[in-house]
Amino acid sequence: MAGEFVNLYSKWRGINRFPALLMMFDLLAEWDAPMARGISLPDVPNLRHWAQTETKLGNPALKAYCAAHSIDEMPDMHQALEWSVAVNKSVEEVVQGGLPPFPYVRECLEKAQALADMMVCSQTPGEALEREWAEQDMDKYVFTINGQEVGTKSEHIQFASDGRYDRTKILMIGDANGDLKAARNNQALFFPINPGEEEASWKRLFDEGLDRFFAGTYAGDYEASLIAEFEKFLPTTPPWKK
């Protein structure tokens, strides 16, 4: 439940898996019910330091770190790598054959393609992103697919836009607070996909959001109203603390 809260039902949804893992440990440590049952949480000081200092939080960087440090030196790092590799394998098995996108996703991409350059910004491993977008024949709509190995979402936008686009002509579409922060860090606009109401959000983007963006009437009250609604879907307090 702590993992689901962090990754799906809180303002931290969409963050990189390693900070999310650490946050889950911290929430469990403060939760009386599981602690009363004698749960033993792993001691991960090296992983904490790495997650705070590494700029490309992904398996390639973690593999390089583990190659330079033995399992006796850094047992938590080697365990984290084993876990992360297993996560990738599990995801590949779960989505084998392809999970179709929400209704109106493809329609939005087709509508925007004629007027915009589009790319993927994600903290999912790049290999999984490329495979899943290709399985749905949606990679043809974007000029690049950026995963966790490339850097943060803010860096993805910065790398692609610096010196190329006016900031008022950049729109980040996302379902997490990290997506909103990435947009704001680059003075870009943001269209929220509300968690749990994805289909309605994509329909709104198709029906009105894209038209407003391309017409130059998106910024201001319209965007602010969408973000105010979006933030209500992202609590900071887990349900067991209420």
What are these regions (language model features)?
Residues M1-E127:
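Alpha-helical substrate-recognition element adjacent to the catalytic core
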